[in-house]
Design a protein with these regions (language model features):
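Sec-dependent bacterial lipoprotein signal peptides
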Residues: 1-19
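A structural signal for beta-strand and strand-to-loop patches characteristic of beta-rich domains
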Residues: 362-370, 398-424
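Disulfide-rich extracellular modules and peptides
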Residues: 23, 246-249, 266-269, 331-334, ...
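Low-complexity, acidic Ser/Thr/Pro/Gly-rich terminal tails and inter-domain linkers that flank the onset
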Residues: 43-71, 409-435
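Bacterial Sec-dependent N-terminal signal peptides
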Residues: 14-50, 386-390, 394, 398-412
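Short Fe-S-cluster ligation motifs
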Residues: 270-311, 355-395, 424-437
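Extended surface/linker regions that mediate inter-domain or inter-protein docking
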Residues: 59, 72-348, 435-458
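Extracellular low-complexity, Gly/Ser/Thr-rich intrinsically disordered linkers
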Residues: 321-372, 395, 401
Length: 458
């Protein structure tokens, strides 16, 4: 949905106040006067659903709807955003309140999943005495996706985050993502879906610290301005942080400021590796292995999944157990959730990156033994099982197959529990006159005792 604003009136201000719920266009040729923008932002701030504490899109979409591009990339990216808190526009952020990340979405090939690819990297060097056996194995150095750096020159730092009198901020990246010398070779592709996210902290009116990760998905037009992505098929959202918070209450990682999985995936992708362990920190692989930690440690060809994190702290997940059946993929992934349009990829686009986190591909494991002959036929004689491509995996495990992910993860107990109905007819408290014998009597009936039917592919 694109907004073209030529004049300002009451109706226009109302439409901008609601813009936090929708998208906007790019390349506006007639900017709105600053006074009009401030009025529009103030009106938007008065709408409770636009509060930045709960609406991750409004900081960008309201501005985009008012004719101010959320993102401009003509050299170092410039990000325009507003912060709405307690019905007002917030104007007291400092550079220490924000960190920015930027990534592009690269479509998968040969059956591989689409992946976010960050534009900014740092190099981690393995530390002597850290890692498996305390040795520098399996890698001495590794690249890790990261956030944009702060300027070191005081003058440039002062100009990196600017509050505009019209009621919004402009952040200028230190990294010029159009210069491959600054992006570890990652090429800027304006036509691809991009994402900018903020690690944002601020105080609300009650004095409480708010930690949020607003983000926006967009492409870049010929003028270098953002065009918001409104087609769910043109992004990648596999899981919603609300699913995580169902168990974790409030997800908060890396010091507590990274609270949304849509932000996590911008760094946790195939471009990030832990130098001390050699583990690739792609979010799908890492999170699945963490939740399956106990099973991996006790399975055939077992694995003690360990990551060396902040200040080389060792984090072993061998004692971590998912609080229910590991086959229940829909706890975290569901295409029926509007917030996760790619939530059904676990069953429609099976991949080694996800599946082999639970199905251990170590030498001697059941998976390795069962698939080595297949690899020898489809790849090359003597090829390891993990040499099979995702496209080859889909030949056997695609939708409709008896070996599809949905079929083999079907859980009869879970399905029956959802259908089981028990009616409590009455509850009575029983007591004696001297209170020496007390009891509670519950009468109940079970009108339905369904038998679950497995998927039709069985």
């Amino acid at each position: 949905m694109k907004h073209s604003l030529a004049r300002w009136g009451t109706a226009c201000l109302v439409s901008i106040a609601l813009a936090g719920c929708g998208g906007g266009g790019g390349g506006v040729s007639t900017p709105t006067p600053p006074a009009g923008i401030l009025g529009a932002l103030s009106a938007a701030a008065a709408v409770a659903s636009n509060d930045t504490a709960t609406n991750s899109a409004a900081p960008f979409t309201v501005l985009q709807g008012a004719g101010i591009p959320a993102v401009t990339i003509n050299s170092p990216p410039k990000i325009n955003f507003a912060v709405f808190s307690d019905g007002a526009v917030k104007s007291d952020l400092a550079i220490t309140n924000v960190s920015f990340a930027i990534a592009k979405l690269v479509p998968g090939t040969n059956g591989d999943p689409d992946q976010w690819v960050n534009y900014i990297y740092r190099k981690e060097t393995a530390t002597v005495g850290v890692g498996p056996g305390g040795s520098l194995v399996p890698v001495a150095t590794a690249w890790q996706a990261t956030t944009d750096g702060k300027q070191t020159d005081p003058t440039l730092l002062a100009a990196q985050l600017v509050y505009n009198s019209a009621g919004y901020y402009t952040y200028t990246f230190k990294t010029d993502i159009k210069d491959i010398a600054q992006t570890n070779g990652v090429v800027f592709e304006p036509g691809r879906t991009h994402r900018v996210a903020i690690q944002l902290s601020y105080k609300n009116a009650a004095g409480a610290t708010v930690l949020v990760n607003p983000y926006v998905d967009f492409t870049i037009d010929a003028n270098g301005n953002s065009v918001l992505v409104t087609d769910p098929a043109k992004t990648r959202k596999m899981t919603d942080v609300a699913s995580c918070n169902g168990c974790h209450e409030k997800l908060g990682l890396h010091g507590g400021g990274r609270v949304d999985t849509q932000y996590c995936v911008m760094c946790h992708n195939p471009g990030t590796t832990d130098a001390n362990s050699g583990n690739v920190l792609t979010l799908s692989t890492m999170v699945h292995k963490i939740h399956a930690g106990k099973r991996l440690a006790t399975a055939i060809g077992g694995e003690d999944y360990t990551i060396w994190g902040y200040q080389n702290s060792m984090n072993s997940y061998a004692d971590v157990g998912f609080p229910q059946d590991l086959r229940n993929c829909t706890v975290c992934h569901s295409g029926a959730n509007p917030a996760t349009p790619q939530g059904d990829n676990w069953k429609t686009q099976p991949s080694k990156e996800a599946c082999l986190t639970c199905h251990a591909n170590n030498d001697g494991s059941d998976w390795d033994a069962n698939h080595k002959p297949i690899a020898g036929t489809l790849v090359a004689a003597g090829a390891p099982a993990k040499a099979l491509s995702n496209q080859q995996c889909a030949h056997c495990h695609g939708v409709g197959s008896v070996l599809s992910a949905e079929s083999v993860h079907w859980n009869q107990a879970q399905v029956n529990a959802a259908k089981y109905k028990m009616n409590i007819e009455s509850v009575a408290f029983n007591d004696t006159s001297d209170h020496t014998a007390r009891s509670v009597t519950v009468k109940y009936s079970c009108p339905t005792r369904p038998v679950a039917t497995p998927p039709t592919t069985w």
